[in-house]
């Protein structure tokens, strides 16, 4: 923690540069940050690693997302599209629900404009998430 405090700007720059060239790293950081924010907003403590909550390795999550790409989506243009939680994390009513919504089967790639217009709406067709 002391090292982080003393080198905050240097570490932030390193992460910024790495996210530009390493799509797996960018995806990991996004999912970890998004999950942490969701738990904080709901007043819960995140007790597990994000990868454990996803239910599979980050590498497999990346493949899962890639298999759902729409025409024109690539890992090179990640940013023009987002990783979307099909059922928004904000819709969770309990900590157990929030944990289930973190599962990889609740993730899909969505064009940025479509994701922004979707917002926190729950789609008509819901998915079953098995843990």
Describe each PLM feature range.
Residues 55, 101-104:
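Short, solvent-exposed loop/helix junctions and linker helices
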Residues 103-130:
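Short Cys/His-centered divalent metal-binding micro-motifs
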Residues 95-101:
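Charge-enriched, short contiguous segments at helix-coil
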Residues 63-95, 106-113:
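Histidine-centered catalytic micro-motifs used for acid/base chemistry in nuclease
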Residues 1-82, 128-131:
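Contiguous alpha-helical segments
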Residues 5-9, 24, 87, 108, ...:
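Intrinsic disorder/low-complexity detector
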